[in-house]
Amino acid sequence: MSLVNEKLKLENIRSALIRQEDTIIFNFLERAQFPRNEKVYKSGKEGCLNLENYDGSFLNYLLHEEEKVYALVRRYASPEEYPFTDNLPEPILPKFSGKFPLHPNNVNVNSEILEYYINEIVPKISSPGDDFDNYGSTVVCDIRCLQSLSRRIHYGKFVAEAKYLANPEKYKKLILARDIKGIENEIVDAAQEERVLKRLHYKALNYGRDAADPTKPSDRINADCVASIYKDYVIPMTKKVEVDYLLARLL
């Protein structure tokens, strides 16, 4: 079986999504060790940078600088990775050989992910406060969180493509009719979502515990908080990506 077909098998997709849960939780744990440090998200005089010809936030600055390097090595040529910033250089490596499993598309919700992360997720996983000495470490952790969230949410395209290929005629009718509600009804699996939330809660509860004293309740991260981030944002945003991808599937 080809690599393309393997990546679109639902059991392989679910396995990838489960591994991504681990990455997201560990990245949240890393970010939780630092206070909110709101200045790293502010622009201009409200922020923490004093650079000539740059008026943006520290987070946006480092994000763009890092993504420029990643772009050079083809990270964003992969159907699993999407940049948060623009004006990136062309890869210095040749184009990938072989066929990608996804239909060509321009779906990228990273601007929405970035806004939600700063305004909603950071306040939930970090405590109030400012630690100037750890601004750099804070933003490095932020970027890891953003990258893992983006990968998880955009992986919905693989789910959508797999479901489309399983019943193309049904999806073609819904797509041609621009029946968003009908598409949503087809892609939703409430029982699976509930299993995901229970698994996430269990992982966050245990990953946050001190290995030296596993009976002690975790104070590193709130498991209810992690599950709520998935329920209120990650899952709904993944559905949005799936729908947007399918609506463009026949173009």
UniProtKB/Swiss-Prot annotation:
GO terms for cellular component: cytoplasm; cytosol; nucleus. One of its GO terms (biological process) is chorismate metabolic process. L-tryptophan binds at N134, G136, S137. It is found in: Cytoplasm. Each dimer has two allosteric binding sites that can bind the regulatory effectors tryptophan or tyrosine. Can bind either one tryptophan or one tyrosine, two tryptophan or two tyrosine or one tryptophan and one tyrosine, which differentially affect the catalytic activity. Activated by tryptophan and subject to feedback inhibition by tyrosine. In the presence of both tryptophan and tyrosine, the enzyme is in the activated state. Pfam families: CM_2 (PF01817). Disulfide bonds: none annotated. Keywords: Allosteric enzyme, Amino-acid biosynthesis, Aromatic amino acid biosynthesis, Cytoplasm, Isomerase, Phenylalanine biosynthesis, Tyrosine biosynthesis. InterPro entries: Chorismate_II_sf (IPR036263), Chorismate_mutase_AroQ_euk (IPR008238), CM_AroQ_sf_eucaryotic (IPR037039), CM_II_prokaryot (IPR002701). One of its GO terms (molecular function) is chorismate mutase activity. Its EC number is 5.4.99.5. It catalyses: chorismate = prephenate. Pathway: Metabolic intermediate biosynthesis; prephenate biosynthesis; prephenate from chorismate: step 1/1. Residues 1-251 form the Chorismate mutase domain. L-tyrosine binds at R74, R75, N134, G136, S137. Catalyzes the Claisen rearrangement of chorismate to prephenate. Acts at the first branch point in the aromatic amino acid pathway where it steers biosynthesis towards phenylalanine and tyrosine, and away from tryptophan. Homodimer. This is Chorismate mutase.
